[in-house]
Amino acid sequence: MSDTPETPLSPYIDHTNLRPDATAADIEKLCAEAIEHELFAVCVNGSWVQHAATYLEDADVSIATVIGFPLGASDSDSKRYETEAAVDNGVHEIDMVMNLGRFIDGDHKYIVREIRDVVEAAEDRRVKVIIETGYFNDEQIATACQLAVTAEAHFVKTSTGFGPGGGIRRPAHFKPFGLP
């Protein structure tokens, strides 16, 4: 038996349905499960943000959405517009996918600008940048993390789940940021 008090995990969990074939019933089920289990948030595609916001109007569950998902290949103006629409529809958190091709080309100014555009459009909402670590070596991952910090993103996420290797990587690439 542990002397450490148990901390409930439910307030730390985002319940997600990003399936392209998700229906209104699927989103309602997701929201109902989040309420039932007292989860932190639901994460849905942008077209479902308003529906989730209506369903969760009186619940203590946040709503997250994805921007530029899953490829990150849309231009920064499109990502900004997606973010503005999500804000208008009631989103609380933004998970954006960084433009991988521009990053690989070394166009760091573009990456910082696109992240800043989303951060600005998100107003006071939390912005997480998905860097898709399966495509990159440790040095590139550290650079992507630094660009996200420079652009004032709140968090970095490792993977959309659609890229190679998912989010499985050695934790060494996060050491420069003081993370365990």
Predicted regions and their residues:
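Alpha/beta enzyme core
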Residues: 3-37, 41, 47-180
